[in-house]
């Protein structure tokens, strides 16, 4: 018998954590109870640090399986930023077609270079921007807005060029920062926004579909081979 730890950045109520739980149910059933999967949302095993959550997966301890965004993986390899170049996709169908095909296979190959087996590429979605100050109807409305962005140099550069006062922050720290007005806005796909109850402290949400990101559902290669 063995126990695997699944980690993700979002909360217990998120679709990411739901995916981990479903995987655990299927593994337990397929192995007759010999493999159990514990769920650690909000990167609990690495004190909320998303990059350290991925490093723990690469090490195979204390994380054996995880679901993290390509944007966080870009801290290890800038090639993962290609997924999130602005205004590349016409629709969700367009993005799905690319990652179900050659682009997805190439990304899996790169993950393999880091000792990871990618079991699937999931949809995180288009990253919408929320804020507590005003409606955003044009890029000019982002001028000097203090916006939390995910840990990606690409996102930092994009939002700075769009005029925002962009800052990086772990997702686990973001709700409190929004509540205390340390930052005035954040950007994320709607499921992550909803799971973290961002709408409680952010009255404005701009649906502009500028940047898309995906999720890599990975297992440590040594664990997979074992």
Map each language-model feature to its residues.
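N-terminal secretory/targeting leader peptides
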Residues: 1-93, 109-226
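Signature of the catalytic double-stranded beta-helix
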Residues: 97-105
């Amino acid at each position: 018998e063995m126990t695997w730890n699944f980690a993700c950045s979002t909360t217990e109520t998120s679709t990411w954590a739901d995916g981990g739980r479903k995987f655990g149910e299927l593994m337990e059933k397929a192995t007759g109870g010999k493999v159990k999967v514990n769920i650690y949302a909000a990167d609990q095993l690495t004190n909320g640090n998303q990059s350290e959550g991925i490093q723990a997966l690469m090490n195979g301890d204390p994380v054996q399986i995880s679901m993290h965004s390509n944007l966080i993986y870009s801290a290890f390899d800038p090639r993962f930023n290609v997924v999130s170049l602005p205004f590349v996709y016409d629709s969700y169908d367009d993005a799905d077609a690319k990652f179900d095909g050659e682009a997805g296979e190439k990304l899996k190959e790169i993950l393999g270079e880091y000792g990871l087996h990618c079991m699937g590429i999931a949809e995180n979605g288009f990253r919408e921007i929320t804020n507590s100050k005003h409606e955003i109807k044009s890029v000019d409305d982002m001028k000097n807005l203090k916006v939390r962005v995910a840990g990606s140099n690409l996102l930092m550069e994009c939002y700075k060029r769009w005029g925002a006062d962009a800052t990086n922050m772990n997702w686990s720290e973001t709700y409190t920062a929004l509540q205390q007005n340390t930052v005035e806005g954040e950007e994320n796909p709607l499921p992550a926004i909803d799971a973290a109850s961002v709408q409680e402290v952010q009255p404005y949400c701009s649906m502009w579909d500028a940047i898309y990101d995906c999720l890599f559902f990975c297992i440590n290669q040594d664990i997979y081979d074992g």
